[in-house]
A protein has these predicted regions:
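A structural signal for isolated positions on well-ordered beta-strands in alpha/beta enzyme cores
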Residues: 2-4, 30-32, 59, 98, ...
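Short, acidic, metal-binding catalytic loop of nucleotide-sugar glycosyltransferases
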Residues: 21-29
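A recurrent flexible, glycine/aromatic-enriched loop bordering the glycosyltransferase active site
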Residues: 146-158
């Protein structure tokens, strides 16, 4: 399987944790990492981690962010998040690739997801999940990027991408121009861009492969999902995380921290 990950120095340890969980259930991995802000120290640590844990093949791509694209950054959204949108123009010799956010945990094989029929669509993704008390935001999320109220807004944390179909649907010039002209209106950053640019071109998949646990009301979480995604700004490695670590599937993070 060809897996795509993008992150910066701040998310290195969390990405390594995700890869540990991925490797536990999946073999024959080639991990493609596109970056614009990884130090030499981080890259060396990454290479040592791959060798020590026998993760798979590692391919690194340095891609400098477009200086003309002024994106809004937060403590968990940086320019590196936008690199996933450029992956099909950077990675060669691959027909499809599975993008995974570094803030997820894998709890099973991803073969079924990776090999699914995309029905001639360039992307497969899961609907963005919202807690009951904030579901009114759904229409606002669609409205601010000029999408119909009945459209399905997807989460960009797990994306199965057909490389050729993606490039047929969107040229790199179109992507550059869109981000250059519209980035200030993208409240949800690269996720907004993906939804707007690929409207009606996305195959929708079950949230088994992208269970956004922070969007579930407390006490109603279903932890028997293949991918648990700690989306939004609340993360289990932060001190203010509302649930005890032992009660959630994030033990690999603690294991990695203890052993390294």
């Amino acid at each position: 399987m060809n897996i795509l990950v993008t992150f910066d120095n701040n998310y290195l340890e969390h990405a390594l944790n995700m890869l540990l969980s991925l490797k536990r259930y999946n073999d024959n991995l080639t991990i493609h990492i596109i970056y614009d802000d990884l130090s030499i120290e981080s890259i060396n640590k990454l290479k040592e981690f791959f060798e020590k844990n026998n993760i798979g093949n590692l391919k690194l791509y340095y891609q400098q962010s477009d200086k003309d694209v002024s994106v809004i950054e937060t403590d968990y959204i940086t320019k590196s998040c936008y690199l996933r949108l450029y992956a099909p123009y950077i990675i060669e010799g691959v027909d499809r690739i599975l993008y995974l956010d570094p803030d997820i945990i894998c709890q099973g094989t991803l073969e079924g997801l990776y090999n699914m029929d995309l029905d001639s669509k360039p992307i497969a993704a899961c609907e963005n999940m919202l807690r009951e008390e904030v579901k009114y935001l759904r229409e606002l999320m669609l409205e601010h990027i000029l999408m119909p109220k009945d459209a399905i807004y997807v989460n960009s944390g797990v994306l199965l991408i057909d490389i050729d179909k993606y490039k047929e649907s969107l040229t790199i010039d179109q992507l550059n121009n869109f981000l250059r002209d519209k980035s200030q209106f993208l409240d949800y950053h690269d996720q907004d861009a993906l939804n707007f640019l690929f409207y009606k071109k996305i195959k929708f998949i079950d949230n088994t492969y992208n269970y956004q646990i922070n969007a579930v009301d407390s006490g109603k979480e279903d932890l028997n999902k293949i991918i648990i995604h700690y989306s939004e700004s609340t993360k289990p490695w932060k001190k203010d995380y509302p649930w005890p670590n032992k009660a959630i599937p994030y033990y690999e993070f603690l294991k990695y921290k203890r052993e390294n």
